[in-house]
Amino acid sequence: MAVPKRKTSPSKRGMRRSADALKAPTYVEDKNSGELRRPHHVDLKTGMYRGRQVLEPKEA
């Protein structure tokens, strides 16, 4: 059975847990429509991603 050889220091434990904190989602302004969208995601209103039409735009 795997057992730790040394005690994990509070610093190491804290560094490991630093990724667990909740962060506010980031948004960028779309160049074409001016709407807010997540970075590296398709704009759902226009269906554009990186200058290409990848989805059919939603009808309003």
From Swiss-Prot:
It comes from the Bacteria. Residues 1-60 are annotated as: Disordered. One of its GO terms (biological process) is translation. One of its GO terms (cellular component) is large ribosomal subunit. Coiled coil: none annotated. Residues 28-44 have a biased composition (Basic and acidic residues). Residues 1-16 have a biased composition (Basic residues). GO terms for molecular function: structural constituent of ribosome. Keywords: Ribonucleoprotein, Ribosomal protein. InterPro entries: Ribosomal_bL32, Ribosomal_bL32_bact, Ribosomal_zn-bd. The keyword Ribonucleoprotein applies. HAMAP family: Ribosomal_bL32 (MF_00340). Belongs to the bacterial ribosomal protein bL32 family. This is Large ribosomal subunit protein bL32. It comes from Chelativorans sp. (strain BNC1).
